[in-house]
Amino acid sequence: MGLGSSKRKEEPPHKSEPKTVGRVKRAGARPDEMIAKYAEVLKTRGILPEYFLVHEAKSSQYIDEDGDVANEFYQETMSDGEKRRLCRLMKNLRPKGKERYAIPRLKHDIPVVIWEVQQPQET
């Protein structure tokens, strides 16, 4: 649903750019090429690029109207002459939001072998 001239045209990449190990362009590189370059940096320099780390994630906790923080909230209810039972509260809760990690963690979908164990050669 747009005009024919509203689409942006991409320019072909320049062939004269030198290929370096440490720098990766995200805009022009395909994801598999980018991962391969990062893996090469990991092998040659022994460092872990920032691309493989997660600094914050969505929290699974909720905040109720009193400001208490928990994964689930329950309320004890009792009707006329019945047993007491716990009912899960679903109303008036808001998600905690994103949580920043004190120590960055590895992404779960890294397609690179970070540590490889080799069997000792018997002579």
Swiss-Prot record:
<feature type="region of interest" description="Disordered">
    <location>
        <begin position="1"/>
        <end position="28"/>
    </location>
</feature>
<dbReference type="GO" id="GO:0051881">
    <property type="term" value="P:regulation of mitochondrial membrane potential"/>
</dbReference>
<dbReference type="GO" id="GO:0005739">
    <property type="term" value="C:mitochondrion"/>
</dbReference>
<dbReference type="Pfam" id="PF15000">
    <property type="entry name" value="TUSC2"/>
</dbReference>
<feature type="compositionally biased region" description="Basic and acidic residues">
    <location>
        <begin position="7"/>
        <end position="20"/>
    </location>
</feature>
<protein>
    <recommendedName>
        <fullName>Uncharacterized protein C09E9.1</fullName>
    </recommendedName>
</protein>
<dbReference type="InterPro" id="IPR029393">
    <property type="entry name" value="FUS1"/>
</dbReference>
<comment type="similarity">
    <text>Belongs to the TUSC2 family.</text>
</comment>
